[in-house]
């Protein structure tokens, strides 16, 4: 296939050229499948590809505008070298054109010196969004192969940190999505699902429309009447940053006023029956150290995986192993009881009656105890979802706020069941012939779920891997400071901040070189002046389609290929481009449509060449 594609591209300037080439978009991380119309060697139109399950034939306005990226008059066509040693926004870098050999020789020399001294002094950053999306995954592998832990995400500190960590800890997945095929009541906090932005945006927009036609009620909690809210059954304006208060008030109504919860689910699939002692910690079996529950069947404490455990208590006070204790569910109800709708109303500006009504509708729509038969298997049916994303966790205490949303679904049993919130995708059974790739959640400490694959890690117990079990903080040896963060997920802005206080963080080396693969980190990582100071301290190699604010601080700029000019075997990950639930899960190969201009080259083959040169 690749050879056939190259022949088509190589013959692009042929007379009477008029072809449609299937490929994959890269204007955002969704990577929708597209068809590209090339006529007489020129791309004239981009459409969605109806033959692919990735995007379901849809394409957004940004995707259609990819032609402007391809033919931008500011595209770089040759490597550039800085001649002005002063780096600042007001300084002309004094760019001069150089050959690829000179560029790669210079970079190789720097890398060999770092490799001999301390590989950790090399850093790399890329993004899952936009033209460099596939390069993000490769950059992580490249840095790991070189021996450096300092690969970081350039999307900034608000890119999914709370949602991804909750998805990993609660679903064994990287992300969560609603099961739109069977959901009947959806509450949206700060998300653009179906309206203007989200995972698998174009596919989920269609699925949202189908669900609305089917009768799903949509309630949007958002300060702004956005593209989702304008299509909702109900838009509830809320004071920015107060979503967590409303979630807790809804939880209070469901647990303490209505008394509606899925006891069977909570007992079988959560740690909420674990007994909690006066110190706030699990009561543990002194023999094996395992947390215990109270079995109502024979009125005694048993560890969580005791095969004789049959009816864990959710409420009550007990004495176990010499300690007076209560199930975690009791503490959850007590914690929620402090958040009355009236109190939450003062904080959120949402009327108390509205909070109480939405909570009641949500609990009722959950149909606790109902089942559905799918493909011959009877499964729990909980057709309610709470959807949240960047708008909800772009504030302080985002992890706790999102935990509140997640708990709403947990208490009614609407997690990883038809109609509820699904992890994407916690289990992969692998290719039937080879068994690869293959992953599934595993039982972590204390019996709690830990993802089989998450954020690029696939082996249980890897220190920088999954969000659960949490890591013990240790003095940092990486610029990401993940050593200090128990459940952190690649916070992109922290290397910039850590570089300002290397002595304070006691990091035992100072980075000397940085690869910037695509993103404009001067803007994406926060304070431009702080990021500029970060860039001034290193030799910077930037792979770019055009010059931007970040290249003011680059030493060498390499002209990259646009997504319509390159071959990518796996454009992005399934959590980004496939809806959750049933469906045809697949990857769509990105195929080149035209050649790169001038001497522009796709950065991944360039980095592979650098790897060969460095050895």
What feature does the model see in each segment?
Residues 1-264, 268-313, 324-325, 445-457, ...:
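N-terminal export/assembly segments and adjacent metallocofactor-ligating motifs
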Residues 82-84, 103-123, 176-186, 334-336, ...:
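Glycine-rich phosphate/diphosphate-binding loops that line cofactor/substrate pockets in enzymes
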Residues 129, 268-273, 361-362, 378-379, ...:
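A glycine-rich phosphate-binding loop feature that marks nucleotide/adenosyl-phosphate handling sites
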Residues 137-216, 221, 245, 310-316, ...:
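Extended redox/cofactor-interaction regions of prokaryotic respiratory oxidoreductases
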Residues 151, 259-265, 353-356, 385, ...:
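Acidic/polar loop patches that form or flank catalytic/metal-binding clefts of enzymes
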Residues 230-238, 561-574, 586-596:
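Short beta-alpha connecting loops at secondary-structure transitions
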Residues 345, 390-396, 592-600:
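Active-site rim elements
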Residues 582-615:
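Long, C-terminal catalytic modules of enzymes
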């Amino acid at each position: 296939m690749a050879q056939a594609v190259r022949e088509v591209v190589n013959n692009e300037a042929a007379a009477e050229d008029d072809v449609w080439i299937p490929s994959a978009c890269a204007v955002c991380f969704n990577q929708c499948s597209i068809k590209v119309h090339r006529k007489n060697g020129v791309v004239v139109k981009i459409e969605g590809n109806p033959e692919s399950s990735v995007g379901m034939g849809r394409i957004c306005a940004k995707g259609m505008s990819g032609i402007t990226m391809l033919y931008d008059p500011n595209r770089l066509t040759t490597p550039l070298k800085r001649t002005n040693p002063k780096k600042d926004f007001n300084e002309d870098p004094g760019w001069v054109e150089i050959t690829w050999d000179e560029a790669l020789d210079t970079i190789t020399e720097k890398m060999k010196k770092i490799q001999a001294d301390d590989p950790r002094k090399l850093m790399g950053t890329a993004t899952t969004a936009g033209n460099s999306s596939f390069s993000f995954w490769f950059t992580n592998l490249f840095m790991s192969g070189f021996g450096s832990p300092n690969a970081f995400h350039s999307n900034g500190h608000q890119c999914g940190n709370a949602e991804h960590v909750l998805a990993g800890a609660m679903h064994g997945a990287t992300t969560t999505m609603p099961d739109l095929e069977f959901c009947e009541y959806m509450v949206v906090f700060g998300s653009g699902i179906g309206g203007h932005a989200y995972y698998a945006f174009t596919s989920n927009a269609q699925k949202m429309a189908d669900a609305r036609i089917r009768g799903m009620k949509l309630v949007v909690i958002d300060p702004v009447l956005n593209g989702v809210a304008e299509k909702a059954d109900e838009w509830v304006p809320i004071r920015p940053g107060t979503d967590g208060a409303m979630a807790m008030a809804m939880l209070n109504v469901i647990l303490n006023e209505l008394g509606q919860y899925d006891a069977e689910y909570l007992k079988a699939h959560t740690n909420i029956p674990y007994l909690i002692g006066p110190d706030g910690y699990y009561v543990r079996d002194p023999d094996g150290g395992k947390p215990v529950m109270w079995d109502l069947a024979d009125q005694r404490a048993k560890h969580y995986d005791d095969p004789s455990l049959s009816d864990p208590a959710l409420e009550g006070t007990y004495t176990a192993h010499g300690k007076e204790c209560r199930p975690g569910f009791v503490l959850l109800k007590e914690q929620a009881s402090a958040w009355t709708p009236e109190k939450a109303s003062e904080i959120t500006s949402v009327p108390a009656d509205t909070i109480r009504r939405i909570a009641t509708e949500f609990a009722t729509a959950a149909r606790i105890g109902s089942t559905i038969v799918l493909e011959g298997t009877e499964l729990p049916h909980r057709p309610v979802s709470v959807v949240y994303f960047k708008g909800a966790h772009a504030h302080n205490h985002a992890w706790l706020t999102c935990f509140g949303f997640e708990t709403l679904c947990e208490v009614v049993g609407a997690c990883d069941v038809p109609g509820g919130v699904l992890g994407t995708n916690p289990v992969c059974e692998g290719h039937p012939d080879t068994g690869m790739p293959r992953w599934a959640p595993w039982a972590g400490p204390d019996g709690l779920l830990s993802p089989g694959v998450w954020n690029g890690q696939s082996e249980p117990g890897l220190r920088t891997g999954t969000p659960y079990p949490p890591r013990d903080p240790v003095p940092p040896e990486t610029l990401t400071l993940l050593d200090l963060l128990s459940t952190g997920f690649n916070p992109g802005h922290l290397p910039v901040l850590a570089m300002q206080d290397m002595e304070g963080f006691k990091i035992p080396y100072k980075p000397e070189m940085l690869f910037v693969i695509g993103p404009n980190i001067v803007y994406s990582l926060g304070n431009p002046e702080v990021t500029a100071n970060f860039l001034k301290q290193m030799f910077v190699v930037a792979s770019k389609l055009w010059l931007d604010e970040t290249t003011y601080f680059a030493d060498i700029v390499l002209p990259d290929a646009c997504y319509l000019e390159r071959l990518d075997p796996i454009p992005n990950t399934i959590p980004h481009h496939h809806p959750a639930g049933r469906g045809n899960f697949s990857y769509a190969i990105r195929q080149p449509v035209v050649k790169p201009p001038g001497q522009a080259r796709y950065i991944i083959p360039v980095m592979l060449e650098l790897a060969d040169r460095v050895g």
